[in-house]
Amino acid sequence: MKTEFYDFIKIDKNYKYKNGDFSAANGECLTAEERIEFLKAYSDFLEKKNGYEMPEKAVSDEETERLAAALKYKIAHKIRKRIRVDEMAAETYEKPENFSSWQFYHGVSEKNGELTFSDGVIPPVPCAKYEFECEKLTSFAFSFVLPEEYIDEEKKNGKVIPLTTDTGRIIELRRGVTEMLKLQIYRNGEIHARVGIPDPYHHRNFKLGDFKVDERNTVLIDLYEDFYEVKFNGTPAGRFEFTNKAMPDTLFISGGMHPVCKWSFKPESLTADGKTTTDFFKVAEPKEEGKQNLGRVELPFKIGGAKNKDKIIELSEKFVYDGGRAVLNIGSLDPCGKVYINEKFAFETDGFLKGEKDITKFLKTGENELKLLVYPRAPEINYSWHRNKDPYIAWLARDVYIDILPEGYIRDLVVKTVGISGNKVKAEISFKTVNFKKGLKTKIYLAKSPCGEEEVIFEGDAAESFETETEFGANLWTCENPALYTVRVELIENGNPVDDEICETGFRIIEQKNGDILLNGKKILLNGALWMQFLPPYENIVLSHICPTTKEIVWQAAMTKALNGNVARFHMLGYGNNDPRFAEVCDRLGLMNIWTTRLIDSAETIDVKNGWRAGKIYAEQMQEVINHPSIIMWEGSNEFHSSRAVLDKMYDEFVKTVKAADDTRLICPCSHLYYGGGLYGNKGFYYQDDGKFNQDFEPCESSFGWKDENVVRSSHNYEILLGYGNRWDIFREQAWKSQPALFKSKDHAYIISEFAIVGRQDNRTKEAEIYHKDDSYELADEKRAFGEAYEKLDFKLSQAYQALCAYNTVKYMRYLGADGLMWCSLSGGANDGSYIKPPIDFYGYKKQAFYALKEGFAETICFDKKAEVAYNGKYVCEPVLTGAEKGKTYNVKMEIKNQSGEVVCERGFAVKATAFTFDLEPFAVDLKNGYYSVEYLVEA
């Protein structure tokens, strides 16, 4: 093993300040001009070191193709007959509606000119759309009724101000997909105008008033050339800018991201071109379906985008049936759909949930036809802060197969690793026997995947609910050697196997002990990036965000590995993910992941009164992917501002639900709730690590969920890691008082599950010539960081600063004791391609920060523990070795080179590790004015 790491410093004998900060509030740092000069020198150094002349892909197209082909194998049953439906004939056609100009999505009904939206327990949330034509819209009036059940009493009583990320009922006027104006009804009892000026991704909220529950509330919007005015319940509520100036032609009514309760909406009047419409629901005239034949398509299959708006996907396939119980399995029809067998309606899916139905009664001997209808997704916007302009996110059909089953058969096979000793594994294997009867036997086989020779690891009596612990020899699953095995369970009747069930899995134990994360008993750091999954080309983002191709999944995994990452935190905004392909790819490539299920952010819906309504379904989603070794952690919510009562309930409900389904993995109920207590200006509630004090260190005892032994601590501490353009002195001081206990905790590991600094994209690529978007809202971070010097930045200096920050934040957090570091995010593409935090651009090209993170994420590295860049002649290096194995000997070489690459100081020695992170002997050296690289080489 050999690793390299680099510090970069400036020597100036006239530098007179105590700390060598790049920037600081008191001015004791590099001047604005010196910062630009520093970055020019640093950019030159990085280009030479990294061989950067033109942008280079993090993973080549050829390598992605090779990996995808190598991972494509399937494991198969030996007894059970499975009819796989990998391809289907596809057609699309416009979804018919009862009323002209309307589209109802997922549970909307009309009566007496009023729409009722019937929320369920999980998404999709009912929505409706009305399209109209006019030259000039001058006013629109509507009314709504929300029950008391909609109110979040804590938010209302606490007068909690809505955030950009808060969900709620939305009434929006658009021009096609372009937003003109938006009103949002929040659960704190208020209705607001949301204005996307100057930043369309972060709307400003303007309160219109408090709405009445269980009564009709009225809204009148008068539209003028440059602004609109709102009257709420008859009272003028304000004048506001349009987010975009154009003439609306679409009314969109959204229920928000999370279901809450039934509510109603009534369009009262619409005045356009001098005419007023009050009758909105005219019966639509029948029209021919006008099907478009797409030919044969592979599953999963999806369509999306405004060009396909409101189209139903119809998929059909013929298959031969020759008897037996036939059970149809559908991974997902998302957002919802229907199933027909031989032109007869069979069943409707429960939203996007897995469908499993006995279809025997619909079948005939010989040829049969399966037909699936997938209904279009509403043009909803569940993540405005990272949205793309086109809101028609794809609708899709996932994997489909038909099992032919005997009277008694196996289901719900689960394999858990419960103990390891060298190459000996103890596994708990369980399954259910449907229609169990006495005398049934079982035999369990193990084979190396994909096609190793089977060995019997258990045989004995079966049971209705079977569970056994068995010990056997096997290689452990690790990121470096992702050993996988096929476990096959046979059900035997009268000496003959009648059914079998299979799963591919790996054997490993993930746990936290003494505040560390251990994989197979070895301390590891969880280093990697978020997958937000806005993938190129631009017009395909609507498709890949929710349903990428398997090759695109492989591409993301390969890029994460190229970054020296060992973990992906799945963060597919608005929709999450429960597609087993992600886990399968990560299993086979050796990449751990943090899993959200399709119910991303669902833990936010947990409240004191109702608990977690979707908890049972979250647990069901867990069971679909339970055997994948790459999944090491379950996540419930992203960022959340909480009260004490809600926090206790959230953690208790999430921990209880998750552990009932799986007690072998780590748990993260919320990845960041540290608002207040010295981090960020927002007031929020949280406990100190020990659960005995609150954010202000006042005595306060937590409930059991906060203290659970599987729960990790997690933060998004951008503010003190140079994020948002913050200063170097804030970073160096790390003044958040709650954090030292997180670093030192012996009960819980502490991961920084989001951090990042911006770096502009290099547009000198063939892809960027076709499409790129430079006007990023994140450039405000650079303006804040550089002030008057901002205008002197170009993409090279921007990338140099991002790399400088990446080197220093990673090394400093590793030195202080972080157990994980995850950059936000892996690659660009969010915000219409203008999101510039990722170290890999939208098209997969490396920025300079890629190299910094790759080196910083290496297992064992050496660096100067000071996060400073300027010195006044004498440089004192305080080297640290981290990622070491106690008792192991490491050869360390340090070289200080000037700008010409000449070595001006060299040190080399062998050192025996005394801890995971430990100090080496400091040394001082007098240097001439100039810029120097401090290079560290570690060999073991």
Language model regions located:
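Flexible glycan-contacting loops in extracellular carbohydrate-active proteins
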Residues: 240-264
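Secreted/periplasmic carbohydrate-active enzymes, especially glycoside hydrolases
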Residues: 1-106, 110, 116, 121-122, ...
